[in-house]
Amino acid sequence: MKVIKLLFITIMLVSFGSFAQEKEVKEEPKLEEHANINKFRQLYQEFSTPNQYRSASGAPGPKYYQQRADYEMDIRLDDENHHLFGYETITYTNNSPDVLDYLWVQLDQNMRSKDSKTPLIEGGGVEPFMQPSGFAGAYLSEPFDGGFNIKKVLDKNGNPLTYMINQTMMRVEMPEKLKSGKDFEFDIEWDYNINDHVNGRGRSGYEQFPDGHRAYVIAQFYPRMAVYNDVEGWQNSQFWGRDEFALPFGTFEVNITVPADHWLDGTGKITNRKDMYSKTELARYEQAQKSFENPVVIRTQQEAEKLAMMPGSKAMKTWKLKADYVRDFGWTSSRRYVADAMAVKVGGKDIMAVSIYPPEGNPLWEQWSTKAVAQTLKSYSRMTFDYPYHKAISVHAKNQGMEYPMICWNYGRPDTEGNYSDRVKFGMISVIIHEVGHNYFPMIVNSDERQWTWMDEGLNTFVQFVAEQDMGENYPTSIEGLDAYPSRRGPAANIVPYMAGDQRYIAPIMSKGLNTYQFGSNAYGKPGTALNILRETVMGRELFDYAFRTYSERWMFKHPTPEDFFRTMEDASAMDLDWFWRGWFYTTQFNDMGIESVEKYFVSSERNQAMKDMMKARNIDESRIPALVYMVKEGSVDYKEDLKGKEASELVGELKTYLMDNFTAAERAMMKSPKYFYDIKVVKPGGLVMPIIIEYTYVDGSTETVTHPAEIWRLNDKEIGLSKASTKEIIKIVLDPKLETADVDTSNNTWPAAAEISKFDQMKK
């Protein structure tokens, strides 16, 4: 009999559901045929088909390959004329299964050649106001001639090779095609004028000081091999100045000749350090190798200032550096440099954290630069893999923020009196963390920056946020007076102004860097925030951190694509995140949710109006309706005051009987006893799918937060209904109480709605 009764109830409930749907169909217009527009559909159309080079799991495939380029270089710096001369031997190894007809070499300095087309692709018209240096550069000065002067391109036997230069790319013709597994050795001789990076901008160049001396930060200074891979073939897109680089790994042996009074460092190990350092400097360096708490000054400010007061040395000396398995090379040189260093323990190895800066950087740089480098190595190694190189250098260069293997340039300078604000201090620490962090992305996890800016900048910005928070915790004096490090990017609320902006000037993250509006927000802020939300709100730290580290370890010293990242994050976590990638990375949709209504219900044993309406519509006799638990809305025709505050089993005898018949006394004692039932309608004016985080505040002041996974939107992308049963009355409901989901309009996130303040009252305040 009990089974029959339950079966009838089930039939009745299904019938009622059908009845409700019929009513909805009458009210809603008929939907025409359409393609699958569900936001939870898989990314099969967007993703390429897995193959032997890149697997469906996101890992490198069984036949994954990458090319290799090894360099031997002799470089000479003419400090007086700020000119650079170079000669290199490149050994290029073809590990691909393809036969190569020619080689492509990158000539990035040609972006600064006199006939460069870079200025001609900007269409902004006349700017309403400009700095004097900018005005002079745009309208008064002749274009700076900073392009490569290619003197020779020779094979290993000294025979000239045919080559063709197209702006920033040079095609080199080989005597015969380069077969799979073979290598080709050739030489290039070149020189170029070094630019003033302070007045003329740029990632490389020199800063001129009032005393007549200069500090050089040198990169993109040599003809560099382009990448050839299974995705792009030759990545030979032109360098226009903003979108960065794609480079193969290799070994660098570089000899750099500079004035004898210069202090130099760069990518790789200094193999003749004993010849370059004084005995005092060498002793200080050896002391720094044993100092894990505080930096040790190797070249003091007094020593640097003394050299700066003297005429520059006419003698020259050659520094020798060697780097294995790096994708690029950068270096810095000046007679005005101060240097300090300390050791950092990472994965059982001692890594040197180094800072190099002119006296103008102090006291800020001696206080915080090397400590920021050390914290970066610890935080990034925890989130990805143990740092594999022997050092990481932070160089102070005015208005700079740029990265190369083991070395980077960073801004942040006190005023002439040595004073600085928190803004300058935190700006310096943040840029150091960011640029040192680039050792991991893209120097080791070697993505194609030219095509996908976000793959290094966005991932790096995310880990930067983690490292900044670690910095505040581990160096509390750095954030004195604050509760936490004031990260500019990472917190969800910080990206809201961008995502709520004019859609005409917002591009999807999955856009080529050169073609994006609001470059910083698009390639840095939004992907960094998306990953922070993914970690904290969608996946949880344990799942996210394992998957993120898996991606990093799979692709260290390799060339990943966006799909390799997306697939690995799902493969290592057992989470279907296609909805997240689509919304955050492939569209410009924004998140906007709101509470449209909240209705309070109580339990009754008496038939409610909804049942009566169905009985009438279906012509169902009363005798056929069993005892049911009815939900009565407060304020409705069915509502009676005596229903309030009572348990369901008190009001519905059939429910009490059911519980007695089907559960033991111990089981009944463990059951909840809700007295209040709430129907909460949540609407989604925004297009972006996100979890619903909802906080309930009860009459006694206690709170409860419930997170509904994003999948709650899978069948209705516009609105959903939540039910909440409680033993206590709810007095307040808030969506996204901690601002975790980048909701662009929080004015509709609270129930009861906050009273609007009149303009008159606002003026009174």
Predicted features, each with a name:
Residues 26-106:
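Early extracytoplasmic/domain-onset interaction patches
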Residues 265-266, 577-578, 593-720, 726-736:
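Beta-strand-rich binding/interaction modules
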Residues 24-34, 74, 83, 93, ...:
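A surface-exposed beta-strand-loop module
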Residues 20, 32-54, 69, 321, ...:
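Hydrophobic alpha-helical and helix-loop surface patches within well-folded domains
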Residues 88-90, 94, 107-109, 182-196, ...:
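Short, hydrophobic/aromatic-enriched beta-strand segments in well-ordered soluble domains
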Residues 115-130, 191-252, 273, 343, ...:
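Glycine/proline-rich low-complexity spacer/linker segments in large multi-domain proteins
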